[in-house]
Amino acid sequence: MGAYLSQPNTVKCSGDGVGAPRLPLPYGFSAMQGWRVSMEDAHNCIPELDNETAMFSVYDGHGGEEVALYCAKYLPDIIKDQKAYKEGKLQKALQDAFLAIDAKLTTDEVIKELAQIAGRPTEDEDDKEKVADEDDVDNEEAALLHEEATMTIEELLTRYGQNCQKGPPHTKSGTGIGDEPEPQGLNGEAGPEDPSRETPSQENGPTAKGHTGPSSNSDHGTEAGQIGEPGTATGEAGPSCSSASDKLPRVAKSKFFEDSEDESDEVEEEEDDIEECSEDEDGYSSEEAENEEDEDDTEEAEEDDDEEMMVPGMEGKEEPGSDSGTTAVVALIRGKQLIVANAGDSRCVVSEAGKALDMSYDHKPEDEVELARIKNAGGKVTMDGRVNGGLNLSRAIGDHFYKRNKNLPPQEQMISALPDIKVLTLTDDHEFMVIACDGIWNVMSSQEVVDFIQSKISQRDENGELRLLSSIVEELLDQCLAPDTSGDGTGCDNMTCIIICFKPRNTVELQPESGKRKLEEALSTEGAEENGNSDKKKAKRD
C-alpha cells in the first residue's frame, strides 16, 4: 500500500502531568502512528526547563524519525546554553537555538548519531578492511593486465590454450567462446558488414546475451530477469561473465589483423566521399552546425532544470539530516509570558475565552514571503506546492539537501530553520493551549480543535473526577483518524498533540447532593460521639 499500512496502528503513547510547584501547568499528551508505516513524530513536555520556565514542543519528522528524535533529546539544553537565554532574551534564544541545532546536523559526529537513531549502516573497521582487500585484488589484476600487454600474440594464445597455427576458428560450439561476433571497429564502433561471416544468434550461447543480475556482483549490473546488451557488460562481472570476457581476446586479436587492411582502404574511400560532400554542401553543413548548437543549448537547459528539480535520494546517496528533517514548534512559558517559536507546519493554538488564537504560522512554499526566499536561493515551487518537486513545507530543521547555496546565510536558504516568534501575555481569558503536528490540523481547523477540547475539558466521571487531559487527546486522535486510505491522505498521517492548561484543575468537585450528604454524615458522627459511641470512631481510625 505504499506509504500506508493495511490497517492503522492505533496504539497510543499517552501521559499526564501537573506542572511544577512554582508554575502549575496541568498537561496531557498522546501520540499515535496511525496509517503510516513508521512513527516520525517526537515531543517535549518539560514543566521545569529551569526554576521559572516550562517548555512544551512537537516535532514532525519527514524522511525518517532521526532528526525529530534528535531535536527532542538535545534542543532543550541547546536553548538553555544560548547566551540570549541566560540574559533573559527568550525570543532571541529560540531563534539562535533553532539555527544552532540545524548547523550541528552537518557535523560528522552528529551524522553518525543520526544514522544510529535511524538504524542505517555506518562504516566500521570491518568495512574498511573489506575495502582494503578489494584494493589488493584490483592491484593484482592491474599487474596481470600489464604483464599481458607486453606479451606477444603467440604467448597470449599459448597461455589461454590456443595454437597459433590453427588460424581463426569457425566452430559452432554451444559455449559461444570461439564464435566470432559481428565485426567491430576501434572503440567499439561497428565496422563494415561482411556477408561471408554470418553467425546465427542461437549459436552464440548464453554469454553472447550479456549478463544478468544474479551473475553480477556489481551494484551497477542489470537486475534479475533483465538481459544486458549482446557482447557487452557494465560494472564488475560475476563468475560467468568474467570467464567469457577473459577468453574473448584470443579470437578478436587474430582476426583483427586479417581485416585491418581492407577496413583501412574502405575508411579512406569514405573520408574522400565525405570531403567532396562537404565541399559541395557548405551551406547545408553550416545550417546543420547551427541546429546542433541549438540542440546542445536545449540539452544543457534541460540538464539545468533536472538539477534544480532534484529531490533527496536522486543522487543515490542517503544521509541523515540531508534527506530528512523535522518541523519544530516550541512554547516557553515564563510567568505570564508565552513565547512560541515555529518552523514548519506544526501549530500552536491558544483558547482565549473559547476562541482559537493561532500562536504560529504554517510555513508553506507557495506563500509570498516563502516563495520569494526560495526563488532567491535558486529554487522552484511546483504546481502542487513542493520545493523543487520534493518538500511540501518551506522551513524545517535538517533537510540540508536544500541548503547548499554557499552565497547565502542559513536563514536565507530554500528551506530555512529560522523560526517565526510570537509572544502573548496570559490573562484570565486564556484557558488552555494546544500544540500538535499537521496530522491534526490537516483534518480539523484551529477553532474546531478548541471547540472539541472545550466540550470535553469540564466533563467528570460518576465519582466527580475531571477527565484526564490525555484521554481527551486520545479521543481527538481517534476523531481525526481516517477510516481508510482511499482519500487524499487526510487523516492518514502520524498524530501527536499536547494540551496545556494555564490554571490548576480541581480534580474533584463536590456536587450539591453529595455535599449535603457528607455534611449530614459529619453531623451524625459528632452526635454519636456525644452519646458515648467514640469507640466505634476509634475503631474506624485504627
Curated annotation (Swiss-Prot):
Origin: domain of life: Eukaryota
Positions of post-translational Omega-N-methylarginine modification: R22
Covalent lipidation (N-myristoyl glycine), chain numbering: G2
List of residues binding Mn(2+) 1: D60, G61
PROSITE patterns per record: PPM_1, PPM_2
Cofactor note: Binds 2 magnesium or manganese ions per subunit.
Membrane topology label: Lipid-anchor
Phosphothreonine, modified sites: T122
Region (Disordered): 118-139, 162-325, 510-542
Family the UniProt entry places it in: Belongs to the PP2C family.
Protein name in the entry: Protein phosphatase 1G
Native source organism of the sequence: Rattus norvegicus
Gene label: Ppm1g
